[in-house]
Amino acid sequence: MKHLIILMIISLSLSASTMKMDYVGELSLFGEVANAEVVYDNDGEKYHIKITASGSGIIAKLTNDKQYILESIGLVEDGVLVPQKHIRSEYAKDYKKIKTYTIDRENNKTTISEYKKERVEESTFDIIHVRYDVTYKDVETKKEEVLDTIYKDDLISMFFNKNNNFLAMKDNETKYMSALGSKDTQEGIVVKHIKHEDDKSIFSVNIEKDYLSGGSKDATFVLDKENILYESRIDGILFFGNAIVRRVR
């Protein structure tokens, strides 16, 4: 669920070269459980979008105060973001994981490299003292995979690119979209415009349910007239209630 919530807090207007937004995440049974900062830089030739998210309260304890960072880096061509690299990082005490997607448009392939470092526990039995002696060591692993395909967007640029025209959609109109960076977006998601309400537009996103426990497979999100996310929501998550992300600044 963490990647979906992060995915749904990244819809911003491209009218400014630098933009910063703050969001909080809430679960109906626990209140505020997460926060995120979005920083968007675009000089007209290159862009860099960085999303930093972390849990608070009970979620912080459950995730060992883990911090998540998502980045999209690339070129700007005729006002359109063209991703070259997508990076997903996770940091916690004695833990680091960095997954980098490098897009080679010339050769129509994408290289996915993953680096992970974590502290693991090892125990040996001391037969003399009849006990287990526990030690810890840092273990590093590296993996690489090559996809024989490329995507127009990654899961961040998909919601930033103005040529996707979300605000121009009519009631009940749908868009099928795919993007690099997660199982949901690579296999394709369906965005549906539900209705306009005052100065806001309400949409739904059809998602996979493998990481939900009984929740709705449709998440909703609300954009204001500037194409900036106002709120997103997933209802009926077992044991947790409803998950809501709200803009606070």
Task: Give the label of every model feature segment.
Residues 124-179:
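Hydrophobic, aromatic-enriched interface-forming segments
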